[in-house]
Design a protein with these regions (language model features):
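Short helix-capping segments at alpha-helix termini
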Residues: 4-5, 54, 119-126, 151-153, ...
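Hinge/beta->alpha junction and helix N-cap segments in small-molecule ligand-binding domains
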Residues: 11-20, 63, 73-83, 99-146, ...
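Periplasmic-binding protein-like
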Residues: 29-40, 97-100, 131, 152-164, ...
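Flexible loop/hinge segments that line or gate small-molecule binding clefts
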Residues: 16, 38-79, 83, 164, ...
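Flexible loop/turn connectors
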Residues: 146-252
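Amphipathic helical "hinge" segments at domain boundaries
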Residues: 1-27, 31-34, 116
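Short acidic capping loops at alpha-helix termini that bridge into adjacent secondary structure
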Residues: 94-95, 125-130, 180-186
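Short, well-structured alpha-helical segments in soluble
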Residues: 19-32, 140-154
Length: 252
């Protein structure tokens, strides 16, 4: 889409390295880039200060930060967390762990809030939940699964933030003789095609990343042509896709 507008995209991967992100923003500003589409922003004072200094238009994708007001294209992460918990509750689950990703990012915190509020719709004493934080890696998924198994697998269902963590969890569960979903149900907030390489048919709460990217590019085009008179916030609704990884334990 950027190429169709006659623009050359420069892709920078920070792997959530704060110093690298800030240097990339400064590079874009120094070299008079036409815009920054920022996917990995996290709430921190130094990032906000860097963004305030830049003259380059900034669009945040799938997140916002409280300390810097700018254009955003986001999934409704609160709703996504709520949908996930309610789906598991409707399938009879009352003991559910949420394996989140990076702590402190607005998508994660909004998703956790939605998840917790759905769980708290149940009568007090009828539910148990716990939030574990990760780093979006297979290794963290392996680690969480081992910890849960060591503790006697106290949950019947896991709501997992992304496919990498989910793959790590499933691999470790299978190695230890657990069956998905017979022994443990898994619902993922990510529908990456990468997961298909592992033969997994995970139920997911998902969104269309192509739509998010296209919307961000459209906002950038409007900024370039001075067609945006105010800050724009676009919220996209997540969808539940049911596959084979959630057991309806009401039928047991």
């Amino acid at each position: 889409l950027l190429l169709a507008l006659g623009l050359l995209p420069v892709v920078c991967n920070s792997n959530y390295n704060a110093d690298l992100e800030e240097s990339q923003i400064e590079m874009a500003d120094t070299n008079n880039y036409l815009g920054i589409i920022f996917v990995t922003a996290t709430e921190r004072p130094t990032l906000a200060a860097t963004l305030y200094r830049t003259n380059t238009p900034v669009i945040l994708v799938n997140r916002y930060i409280h300390s810097f007001e700018t254009h955003t294209v986001c999934i409704d992460n609160y709703k996504g967390g709520y949908i996930a918990a309610m789906h598991l509750i409707e399938k009879g689950h009352r003991r559910i762990a949420h394996i989140a990703s990076y702590k402190g990012t607005t998508p994660q915190m909004d998703r956790i809030q939605g998840f917790q509020e759905a769980m708290q719709c149940l009568p007090r004493g009828e539910y148990r939940y716990q939030v574990y934080f990760g780093d979006g890696t297979l290794e963290r998924g392996n680690q969480v699964a081992r910890e849960l198994i060591k503790n006697g697998m106290p949950y019947t269902a896991l709501f997992v933030a992304d496919c990498q963590i989910a793959i790590g969890i499933v691999n470790t569960l299978r190695e230890q003789g657990f069956r998905v979903p017979t022994d443990v149900s898994i619902l993922c907030f990510d529908d990456s095609p990468y997961i298909n390489q592992y033969g997994l048919r995970l139920s997911t709460v998902t969104y269309n990343p192509l739509s998010m990217g296209a919307t961000a590019v459209d906002l950038l085009a409007q900024l370039m042509s001075d067609r945006l008179s105010s800050i724009s916030h676009v919220n996209l609704t997540p969808q539940l896709i049911q596959r084979d990884s959630v057991m309806d334990i009401n039928k047991r």
